[in-house]
From Swiss-Prot:
Membrane-crossing segments per the record: 17-39, 45-65, 91-111
Name of this chain's protein: Transmembrane protein 208 homolog
Annotated spans, Disordered: 142-173
Ranges of Basic and acidic residues composition bias in the record: 150-173
Keywords noted in UniProt: Endoplasmic reticulum, Membrane, Transmembrane, Transmembrane helix
Species: Dictyostelium discoideum
Stated family: Belongs to the TMEM208 family.
Disulfide cross-links: none
A single cellular component GO annotation: intracellular membrane-bounded organelle
GO biological process: one example: vacuolar protein processing
Length: 173
């Protein structure tokens, strides 16, 4: 039997998914009506590619979001788990951002075809986050590891030099 938290999460996720579907429809339907239907003679080539890639990104992000909030039922059909909380941070925020950016780009695409180049913001941001999160710290730690043995050698050399200086003093009997 589901607790009240799972039921609340289920209704909250359903509301959030409904809002996302509305946003996707608000971005896609005007674009189809204006660019594909009304200006069909100028809609071709790379515009089809841009439109399909925007929708592919939208559908990919929406699929991931819906799979995250998948409900779990027991054998009796009662709700066990309401799925993940869609208001949590982490990757969920990025999937929502992908949907929002794609819809904004489609809206701007009604004004000018050149606005569709803004789709490059998504992979640019992904590369930036990967660099900042994984590659940059890896390279920084690697450089520090290479510098540490050199520093240790210099400390050893300093100790050896100090010992040699001390041994230069001769005792007279």
């Amino acid at each position: 039997m589901a607790n009240s938290g799972a039921k609340k999460r289920k209704t909250q996720n359903e509301k959030e998914l409904f809002k996302v579907r509305l946003i996707m429809a608000a971005g896609t339907i005007p674009y189809i009506l204006y660019r594909v239907v009304y200006h069909s003679e100028t809609f071709g080539g790379w515009l089809w590619f841009a439109y399909l890639s925007l929708n592919a990104l939208n559908m990919f992000a929406y699929y991931i979001i819906t799979s995250m909030c998948k409900l779990t039922y027991d054998n009796n059909g009662e709700l066990i788990d309401g799925g993940s909380d869609l208001n949590q941070g982490g990757m969920t925020e990025y999937y929502f951002d992908i949907i929002y950016v794609c819809c904004i780009i489609q809206g701007l695409g009604l004004i000018s075809d050149k606005c569709l180049y803004l789709i490059l913001v998504i992979p640019a941001f992904a590369i930036f986050k990967i660099w900042k999160t994984f590659i940059g710290p890896y390279l920084a730690s690697r450089n520090q590891q290479q510098q540490q043995p050199q520093e240790e050698k210099s400390k050893r050399r300093e100790k050896m030099e100090k010992k040699q200086e001390k041994q230069k003093v001769k005792y007279v009997k």
